[in-house]
């Protein structure tokens, strides 16, 4: 829970100043605009902290009203908003077997995955801040698309009732894409369509300025904008095309920084996956374990490290990696 607020404060107050990984994009957002109402970074962090504690309390109350004990409600609210995923049961959030708890958890994970600076702007009176943020638009659109597709797959191909399919897809997809790690079913057994989806969304994470880990949605936006601009240059060599993020032009420095981040991320992932494979793990376990470790998700894929497995059975050398 403390790590969750720490990630937010770093993303808002520190990383933009360090100008690494494309985070300098948020220097104007987290410093200049917010300083009009809250002049110092410490005040911004304090306001974000109040929001964070408030959301934790709201989700604890919701879990309690949904049927959890007071202790379980508080414990799960702390790991839901922080997208940490720790549960008081080995069966994770699925232990409670409650649709109400599942959907409340899904909503909490989404809340934790959105930019907290936007919550602050909303409370300051900018009611359109959340809807106008393109990073939020991309993230929620991606989540909705994945839920619809996976629900359809479970319903049509796995013969699961539509209501159950929607519930399973919603909770587990949101959990993995946000890096929370709650599970209610072994999604590794959902078939050939679901397996690659869960593998690739491990890398995504949520929005910058949220409690999530992963690559973050804004970097995919910058990558897309840069690639789109290059394609336009190829088609019209004499044209002038400028990549944009959130309706603001993206500098070459930001693009270079984001591309460097992608390179270092996947270089580290490749080394880790190859190392796990060298130690005797099968392809699926090695690659998904590397992905879930570097993205700080939790469950991987396969019988060893999947939702129904545990890293305990891995060789000691693999655990060190």
Residue ranges and their predicted role:
Residues 1-321:
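Membrane-proximal intracellular helices of multi-pass ion channels
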């Amino acid at each position: 829970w403390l790590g969750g607020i720490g990630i937010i404060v770093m993303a808002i107050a520190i990383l933009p100043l360090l100008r690494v990984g494309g985070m300098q994009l948020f220097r104007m957002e987290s410093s200049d605009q917010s300083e009009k109402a809250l002049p110092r970074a410490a005040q911004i962090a304090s306001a974000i902290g109040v929001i964070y504690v408030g959301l934790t309390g709201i989700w604890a109350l919701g879990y309690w009203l949904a049927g959890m004990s007071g202790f379980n409600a508080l414990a799960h609210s702390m790991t839901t908003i922080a997208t940490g995923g720790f549960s008081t049961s080995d069966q994770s959030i699925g232990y409670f077997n409650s649709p109400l708890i599942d959907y409340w958890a899904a909503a909490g994970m989404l809340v934790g995955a959105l930019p907290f600076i936007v919550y602050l702007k909303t409370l300051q009176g900018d009611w359109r801040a959340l809807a106008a943020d393109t990073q939020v638009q991309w993230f929620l659109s991606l989540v909705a698309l994945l839920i619809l597709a996976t629900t359809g797959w479970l319903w049509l191909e796995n013969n699961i009732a539509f209501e159950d399919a929607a519930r399973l897809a919603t909770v587990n997809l949101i959990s993995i894409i946000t890096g929370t790690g709650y599970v209610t079913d072994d999604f590794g057994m959902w078939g050939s369509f679901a397996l690659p989806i869960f593998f690739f969304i491990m890398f995504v994470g949520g929005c910058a300025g949220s409690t999530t880990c992963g690559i973050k949605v804004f970097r995919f936006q910058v990558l897309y904008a840069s690639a789109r601009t290059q394609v336009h240059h190829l088609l019209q060599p004499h044209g002038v095309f400028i990549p944009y993020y959130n309706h603001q032009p993206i500098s070459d420095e930001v693009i270079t920084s984001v591309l460097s981040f992608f390179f270092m991320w996947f270089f580290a992932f490749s080394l880790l996956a190859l190392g796990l494979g060298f130690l005797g793990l099968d392809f699926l376990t090695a690659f998904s374990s590397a992905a879930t470790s570097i993205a700080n998700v939790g469950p991987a894929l396969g019988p060893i490290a999947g939702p129904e497995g545990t890293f305990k059975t891995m060789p000691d050398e693999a655990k060190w990696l």
